[in-house]
């Protein structure tokens, strides 16, 4: 039995998730997890063959876990680059363009860690990075709230239409 009960995967939609959530109908983790990599809250990991579809994330949901040896795991120096700012950079067009240039291979294109480290990150001072991340976080929260209100209004409309034509 592993000391790390969370066997994790990185989803392009949800970030770090338990493998059991991603692969509900089967257990994909090896019985021998000795070669698995340990990740802690704040660490980043990506699948080098799936980063082009967004399979890179920072661990936030769990305190720790393990990931398949195929993942590249790293931690950034938070005194130089704010983790939330870096996370936003990973979602940017600038990152995607830089990544695309560095992908290697023809069928399953991969991004090595060395190639990842070559990507230039525009870095204002740490205080400004934190301010940017905080402001974008507020905007994201507002968008989530508005989307949930829109869903509620759509459900209410559907209910009213059903009641009108019973």
Where are these predicted regions, by residue range?
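Amphipathic alpha-helical coiled-coil/heptad-repeat segments
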Residues: 122-166
């Amino acid at each position: 039995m592993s000391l790390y009960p969370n066997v994790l995967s990185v989803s392009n939609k949800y970030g770090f998730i338990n493998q059991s959530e991603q692969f509900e109908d089967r257990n994909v983790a090896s019985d021998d997890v000795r070669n698995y990599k340990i990740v802690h809250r704040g660490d980043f990991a990506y699948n080098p063959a799936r980063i082009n579809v967004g399979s890179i994330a920072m661990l936030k949901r769990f305190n720790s876990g393990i990931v398949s040896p195929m993942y590249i795991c790293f931690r950034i120096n938070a005194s130089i680059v704010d983790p939330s700012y870096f996370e936003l950079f990973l979602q940017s067009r600038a990152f995607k363009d830089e990544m695309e240039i560095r992908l290697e291979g023809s069928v399953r294109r991969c991004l090595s860690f060395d190639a990842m480290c070559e990507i230039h990150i525009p870095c204002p001072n740490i205080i400004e990075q934190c301010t940017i991340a905080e402001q974008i976080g507020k905007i994201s929260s507002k968008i989530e709230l508005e989307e949930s209100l829109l869903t509620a209004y759509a459900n209410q409309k559907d209910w009213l239409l059903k009641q009108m034509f019973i």
